[in-house]
A protein has these predicted regions:
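Cell wall/extracellular polymer interaction/catalysis modules
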Residues: 353, 365-451
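Sec-dependent N-terminal signal peptides
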Residues: 1-37
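Extracytoplasmic
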Residues: 78-80, 87-89, 107, 131-135, ...
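Boundary regions of SH3-family modules and the immediately adjacent low-complexity/disordered segments
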Residues: 38, 68-80, 129-264, 295-337, ...
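Exported/periplasmic cell-wall-interacting domains
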Residues: 402-405, 429-432, 438-439, 444-451, ...
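Short, structured beta-strand/loop micro-motifs enriched in basic residues and often containing a Trp
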Residues: 87-97, 254-264, 336-348
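Ser/Thr-rich, Pro/Gly/Ala-heavy low-complexity intrinsically disordered linkers and tails
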Residues: 32-73
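SH3/SH3-like (including bacterial SH3b) beta-barrel domains
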Residues: 95-110, 262-277, 345-358
């Protein structure tokens, strides 16, 4: 499984400007912690993120870092009070130099307050238009290179920032799911681009032709002509060769690889999208060249509106915040056909009382269970009972050795499929999760989550996850919400593509409903300063401890309800 956290990028890419009619919002929340002393920075991924793209009608292009020139000291200037990030990964470094470790990072369009500076220009390449450039210390700790390709003083005239994440919502961005094969462009495509990369759309007999079918009087089925003075076939591009390669692989009976979908570097195409791939949405833009509406994605790509369906039916399930009136043990109904029972007076059985919906919560009584043959029933505080097979239980656990009296830590029971957050010995939150599907006693398609004691290594408001999975083919989900990595590529994160929490569904990560993942993300350490998109743990600000365990010896794989397979017809889970 490959995942592509933005913080791994070694080369920043820039957001272009978009038409002035679009309004943008900036996010600035949360208190600022002290900068931690860092652990080792995570290793780079096996692939770099796709470069963002520019709108065709840019009002003010971003600064090109490659064209930046060192600036000689000039006349006195007024120190800027805030900066705006231009790159998809704008690092905040522990010291004012390029090779210093990163404390965290900003995403394009984010603004943060400047505390002081500049503290020199060691490795900070400054554009000649910014004599005030250099390393500035920002709120939250650390230094940002200002005046080059990463960030500039705010406000930046003419810059149209992408929509910033909403930290008050269950989902930080709106999302769309792709249906059929479509193309993510690096900029708004022209008619010439469509002729080359989507020639089938110029045939009136093609249902998906849209408004371009009659463009410039093209007849049905007429092939595109070569540009003047060009003898080569314009459709013989790396991007179309990639499309043919995908088709050939499918004709041979196998799924394409993720790399087969990538466009030619520097060309108009970022990549091709397959059914079930998700993108995070910024805003719509109408192309003047084709008179079509395109979604600009948070990654900077452009996807035709007609190919994307908005994601609306994500799970609103919420676990239980624990306090003096709400305590463990708790249980949730996870069966589609669950019943609540009335115990017999002699305690030797129970009779059915009423059907209850899936995800119904129960407060369990501190009483012995009811056993009837091979069945076990847990008593509830209201005098009823629930069948052990139909529910998942969250029980109080003694803190592991070494946990401080108020230290935050997370307990994940992989057999019960529940998560409980603690502060010392006090539980503060409990909910259902979905861990890796598969059986730890079998190596066949085994995506089981790891067990052991870990710590949160990094936290990201969103992070893209994609890769190739044997049997399932490639998958791609841009900007997965509320991500906290705890062991290599394993993370706790929100999942909006399924709702079967309480069942094993993932490729190894710990899935939570978006509202639950948001609650845990905002609660956990290390703290995320205002305006930052991601933060790394350190020795002075370690990440919250995460315990993953099995509560039952040799517990078999329980599978998932039959309706779970019907719930998400596309896109494998993460």
């Amino acid at each position: 499984v490959r995942r592509s956290p933005w913080f791994h990028s070694t080369r920043a890419a820039f957001w272009g400007a978009i038409p002035a009619a679009v309004v943008f919002a900036l996010s600035d929340r949360a208190p600022a912690p002290r900068a931690p002393a860092l652990l080792a920075e995570p290793a780079p991924p096996s692939h770099r993120p796709a470069e963002p793209v520019d709108a065709s009608a840019a009002a003010a292009p971003p600064i090109d870092a490659s064209a930046a020139e060192p600036v000689d000291a000039g006349p006195p200037f007024e120190r800027p009070t805030s900066l705006i990030a231009l790159a998809t990964w704008t690092p905040v470094r522990v010291e004012p130099r390029r090779d210093a470790q990163a404390l965290g990072y900003l995403r394009a369009g984010a603004t943060v307050d400047i505390l002081d500076g500049p503290a020199g220009r060691d490795g900070c390449v400054v554009h000649r238009d910014h004599p005030e450039g250099g390393w500035y210390r920002v709120r939250g700790g650390g230094y940002v290179c200002v005046g080059g390709g990463f960030a500039v003083p705010a406000p930046y005239r003419g810059y149209r920032a992408p929509t910033q994440p909403d930290l008050d919502a269950g989902m930080p961005y709106p999302y769309g799911i792709n249906y059929g094969q479509s193309i993510m462009y690096r900029r708004l495509p022209t008619l010439a681009d469509l002729r080359v990369y989507e020639p089938w759309r110029f045939s009136r007999s093609t249902p998906d032709a849209g408004p371009v079918a009659a463009a410039e009087g093209l007849d049905a089925g007429t092939p595109p002509t070569s540009p003047a003075g060009t003898e080569a076939d314009p459709s013989d591009t790396a991007d179309n060769r990639a499309a043919r390669r995908v088709a050939e692989v499918r004709d041979a009976g196998g799924p394409p690889r993720l790399g087969d979908l990538a466009g030619e570097r520097g060309g108009p195409v970022v990549r091709r999208l397959l059914s079930g791939m998700y993108v995070a949405l910024d805003r719509t833009i109408r192309s003047s060249g084709t008179d079509e509406v395109y979604w600009r994605t948070q990654s900077g790509g452009f996807v035709r509106n007609g190919r994307l369906a908005p994601v609306r039916n994500w799970s609103r399930f919420q676990g239980q915040v624990l306090d003096e009136t709400h305590q463990l043990p708790l249980a949730w109904m996870v069966s589609e056909t669950g019943w609540e029972y009335t115990p017999f007076a002699n305690g030797l059985g129970a009779s059915s009382h009423r059907r209850v919906p899936r995800l119904t919560p129960f407060v369990l009584a501190d009483a012995p269970p009811i056993r009837s043959g091979a069945q076990t029933f847990w008593r509830t505080v209201d005098g009823r009972a629930v069948n052990q097979r139909n529910v998942r239980r969250a029980l109080l656990r003694t803190p592991p050795e070494g946990v401080g009296p108020t230290e935050k830590w997370i307990d994940v029971d992989l057999d019960e499929q529940v998560l409980v957050a603690y502060e010392g010995a006090r539980p503060v939150f409990a909910t259902l999760i979905s861990s890796g599907r598969g059986d730890r006693n079998s190596g066949v398609r085994n995506y089981e989550s790891p067990t052991g004691s870990f710590r949160i290594q990094s936290r990201h408001i969103t992070n893209t996850m994609d890769g190739d999975t044997a049997g399932d083919g490639p998958y791609s989900i841009e900007d997965v919400p509320w991500v906290m990595y705890f062991h290599g590529s394993y993370a706790i994160h929100g999942a909006f593509w399924h709702s079967y929490f309480g069942w094993r569904m993932s490729h190894g990560c710990i899935n939570m409903s978006p509202p639950d993942a948001r609650w845990l993300f905002l609660w956990a350490d290390p703290a995320l300063p205002a305006g930052w998109h991601g933060v790394y743990s350190g020795t002075t600000q370690p990440g919250a401890r995460v315990e993953l365990r099995h509560s039952r010896a040799n517990a078999p794989e329980e599978g998932r309800p039959a309706s779970a397979a019907r719930a998400m017809p596309v896109a494998p889970t993460q």
